[in-house]
């Protein structure tokens, strides 16, 4: 979590850890708009690990994003009580690495899970870094899952948008066969992934999409993966859309269309006055408020209003 330092002595570290990655991510999105796209057609069905947003561009952007992610450190995750390593083998036989935070009671004793929560990460995050953020769901009696995208952390495969979307569709389908209540949580790039999964017709009970781009077709990707094109009246009321007025990674022009279409179709929405990009909020208090909004929607289906 990025928190603004209390003293000037920590400002350099804060800039390196929080500000610099933010600038680099934003620059990479601009690069997507500037690079030439490889020819593609929306009707073409590419191979799983084919590039769909430009052969050079997609490879370079994912390479850049992956370099911003920390090195994998399983001990960081497995040092937490209730966390175990898990893996998922995709349809093209790539093994994705992740973690499960097992459902437990207030004393930490394992309990029969009520359902599951699956988180799809932002582009510079890895699973062992973020599994702790799902502890509240395990404590509420749900198994919480998080995976490294293919080509990230300890996961096999090439870093490709098309493959990542298909991976998560398969993961959700597998989890749906094992649990009663089904909850999805996507941040930034992960929000785009989850909207595509939802658009494929999978069952889910509640979802939160935090700061996802409305479209990727403006950057040379096929319109079939635009999150806004997967939003329908049937699914919108089950999805909470969160954006932030202080987001310097994906601004209003990137996120507004998806949020406003969601609201028009009956989705609860939040455009937080003090929210930045997910996990880049300036204070712990702001981040905690955001986390509680996510938790309330996923666990209780509490309807929230624009602020």
Task: Outline where the language-model segments fall.
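Gly/Ala-rich beta-loop-alpha elbow adjacent to hydrolase catalytic centers
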Residues: 186-194
């Amino acid at each position: 979590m990025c928190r603004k330092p209390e003293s000037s002595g920590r400002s350099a570290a804060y800039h390196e850890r929080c500000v610099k990655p933010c600038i680099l991510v934003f620059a990479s999105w601009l690069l997507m708009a500037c690079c030439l796209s490889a020819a593609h057609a929306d009707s073409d069905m590419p191979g799983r690990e084919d590039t769909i947003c430009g052969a050079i561009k997609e490879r370079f952007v994912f390479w850049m994003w992956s370099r911003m992610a920390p090195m994998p450190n399983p001990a960081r995750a497995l040092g937490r009580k209730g966390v175990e390593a898990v893996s998922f083998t995709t349809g093209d036989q790539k093994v994705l690495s992740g973690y499960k935070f097992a459902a437990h009671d207030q004393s930490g004793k394992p309990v029969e899970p009520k359902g599951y929560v699956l988180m799809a990460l932002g582009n510079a995050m890895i699973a062992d870094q973020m599994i702790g953020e799902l502890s509240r769901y395990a404590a509420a009696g749900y198994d919480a899952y998080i995976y490294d995208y293919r080509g990230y952390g300890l996961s096999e495969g090439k870093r490709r948008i098309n493959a990542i979307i298909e991976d998560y569709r398969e993961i959700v389908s597998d989890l749906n066969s094992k649990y009663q209540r089904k909850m999805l949580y996507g941040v930034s790039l992960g929000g785009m992934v989850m909207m595509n999964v939802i658009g494929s017709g999978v069952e889910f009970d509640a979802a939160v999409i935090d700061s996802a781009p409305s479209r990727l077709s403006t950057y040379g990707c096929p319109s079939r993966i635009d999150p806004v094109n997967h939003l329908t009246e049937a699914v919108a009321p089950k999805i909470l859309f969160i954006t932030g007025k202080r987001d310097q990674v994906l601004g209003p022009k990137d996120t507004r269309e998806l949020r406003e279409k969601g609201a028009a179709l009956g989705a609860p929405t939040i455009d937080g006055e003090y929210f930045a990009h997910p996990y880049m909020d300036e204070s712990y208090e702001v981040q905690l408020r955001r986390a509680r909004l996510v938790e309330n929607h996923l666990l209780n289906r509490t309807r929230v209003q624009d602020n």
